[in-house]
Every structure is written in structure tokens, then in C-alpha cells.
Amino acid sequence: MWGPILFIARPNLWALAACGKARHKERMNRTPHHHPLRLRRSVLSVPAINAKALAKSATLDCDVVLFDLEDSVLPEKKAEARAALVAHFATLDRYPGREHVIRINPLDGPDGVLDLKAVLDCMPDAVVLPKVSEPQDVLTVADWLSEAGADDDRDFGPRLWAMIETAAGLLNLAAIAETGRTEGGRLDCLVVGLNDLRKETGIADIPGRPYLAPLLLQVVVAARAFGLDVVDAVFNNFADAEGLEAECRQGRQMGFDGKMLIHPTQIDAANAAYGVTEAEAAEALAVVAAFAAPENAGKAVVTIAGRMVEKLHADQAGRLLAKVDLINERKRTT
């Protein structure tokens, strides 16, 4: 958990954290919040301090631009980065199919609090919380955003993404993910951070991630249990195209929705791996058409080309085709 949170006016984060248990219990009795389908194949991290990178980000074909105020900004440059980001958002051209999110600093230091104030000026699609270790890390910021008047006509204002990059975060995965299932919880996505996790645990960085695979799958399962999206960690060697493609394929097979990226050259590989091939789209259309046929009305199981297909496969096919629609819409608006 983040340490003691500094006092700031409107709203008081310390007070919000203190009443967290009561708020959490109240939320669990509310109606689950609906998380609409979004494209998150490629999440490119852009240092908020880098003016050239900020300008270039608008021209790139990534689904999500993550403006980073944390690891990629030196402590003495934090204030400058916040000011640059607020100025960038003031002229940002937003369009359907792309999200703009901001990763803040931890709230156990002064920069995290100041970052949240900047969030109110920027109003991104989401706030990315680093090193989330327990549910209260999410709930405190969710309450702060509501109390600060961050709700707007885009449903309920900025959502939250939780970075799972600590041993404690892994141990508390289910409780963290559960905060996203209810009204006001704001949590929309889990993001794996392996660099910090490897540093804390000592797990070896080996190609294929054999010792990390069980932990990665835990994050996927927790996200799916509570209707959240889930994004795989960065691939550090952006010069290794084959290694990136292999890790993107692995992530897709594990069930991730997309991948964190650190360089524009990684975008195409992520979009391809987490996209939909023509063969996949054709198969999905065949499944949907089979269940829509009059002779199959009311059936829970049908046969397609000698293969038994259940209704759950039709649901999966429908979601895949909805993803195709989103991809095509993005192409039309960019």
C-alpha cells in the first residue's frame, strides 16, 4: 500500500483513505458497472517531459497513449513535465477509438498528489496507478476524483488502471480487481509491470518468461473474473523485433488484451498480434450465422464443418466481430 498520504485541500485524501472500508462495503452492494469493449492492443508509454515525443504521439497508430509522469521523468523534472502535459492536453485532438491516459507518481510522495491536480486540468480517459498493492490504493483515488468533481458527460470521468508490479499486488489481486465491478469503483484495466516485479522478487528475466507465466496468468484470471481488461508488460529490447513478436503472441495466447510498449517501432507488432486475422473473422461470422439460421433456433449446440460448436462460442464470436468493427472504425477516423 502507498504510505501516509499527504494532506491537500478539496478533497482530503487522508480522510478519504480513513473511511475506505465503509466505502468499499457500500460499493459491493451496488449494481456492477458495465465496461464497454475498447481497443487496447497497443499502449505506448510517452515521457511527459519529452516535447518531441508528445508531439509525435498524435501521429502514431497505437490504441492508447500513456503519458508518463512516473519512471521516465527525473524527480527534478516532475513539475516541468506536469506543466508540459497540461499544455499538451489543452490542444489535444481526441477522436473515437483512441484513449489518452496518464500514469501518475505514487501517492506516498508529493508528486503523486500534484499529478492528481494536473489530472483535473487534463481530464484523460484514465489515470494509471503505479505499484497498486491493495484495494484501498484504487478506492482512495476513485473517491478523490469523485469528490473533486471529475465526473463528466463521458459516463463518470476518468477511469482507473492499476499496475500490478509488486509481490503484495499479486497476493491481493482478487480484492484489487473486485473494486472495478461496481458503480463508482472506476477500475477498468489491470496492467502488468514486470521490471519492478522482477526487481522485488528476483525472478529471472529469461526469454519465454517460463517462471513468470504462472503469475501473468493469475493477473489475466483476476481481470476476467471482474470484467476488466488486462495489458501485458513491456518488452524492453525494442531492437529485437522477433523477440517482441514472440512475446506478443504469447500474451495473446495467455488472454491479454494488449501490450505496454516503450517505442513506436513496437506498435505494428502489438496491433497485429492482438488484432483479428481474416481467417479468425471468417470463422466468427460462420459461427454467428449458424446460430442465427432458422433451423438452429433455440439450439444450444450446432455442428459446423463436422465440429461441435456451443452457444458460448457464438458469444465469443460476437465479441470478436465487435472488435473488428472497432478496428475498422479507428481506420476510418485516423
Which residues make up each language-model segment?
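Short, positively charged and aromatic/hydrophobic N-terminal segments
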Residues: 15, 21-24
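Expand to "…catalyze enediolate/carbanion chemistry for C-C bond making/breaking, isomerization
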Residues: 24-334
